Amino acid sequence: VQVGASSAIYGGARFALTAIGHHKHVVMMNSEADLIFGPYLLAQAQKTGVVYTSADGDQHTVIKRLINDIELWGFTTVMAGNMKGYLDQRSNPTAIIPEADKRFMDYKMCASYTDGTKLNIEMALVANGIGACTDVPGMHGPQVGDIYDLFQHFDFSKLWNGETPIVDYVLNAYPPGGVFVVGYNDHP
């Protein structure tokens, strides 16, 4: 098994394709490469008879695991989302230098966590993986006090068509950090 843990998008995809070409299973930890090249890499892995998968543990894979659980219990997925603690869409690699230095992080990577880039990549992976969509470009991302407050911010009777799941995120929800899935079941 080969693990792709590079932060280089093209290099990560090339690594995975080379591993697949050598009949190695691939666990991809590079969500950016997975978003852009994942469907192609999966098709190549299937042709070769090996496994290509995302690593469990990042938001998009934890969301998918929750979806698998609620669907096993007989629920239909209505919304899948991320609980983001902080978002500054004006952040950039230069402005984030002091914060990145405190955390010993790469400036571009830290900016991507702060400006919503990473959030959008993860939610695009979820949407592509489950056939979901956003309600509006960029998602809503309301501020909520508690995760259960999301029912006050999303009118699911208007947003959800009964079939296609929605992806979105909430800001500053309690408990901090994490992911959520809203399911529906009409059985008592």
What label would you give each PLM region?
Residues 99-188:
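C-terminal catalytic/substrate-binding lobe primarily of soluble NAD(P)-dependent oxidoreductases
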Residues 6-22, 29-51, 55-57:
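Rossmann-fold NAD(P)-binding glycine/threonine-rich loop
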Residues 15, 39-42, 65-67, 90-92, ...:
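Short secondary-structure transition/capping segments
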Residues 26, 51-52, 77, 134:
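Hydrophobic beta-strand scaffold residues
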Residues 45-47, 53-118:
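Rossmann-like NAD(P)H-binding beta-loop-alpha module
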Residues 2-4:
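Redox-cofactor binding/interface segments in oxidoreductases and associated redox assembly factors
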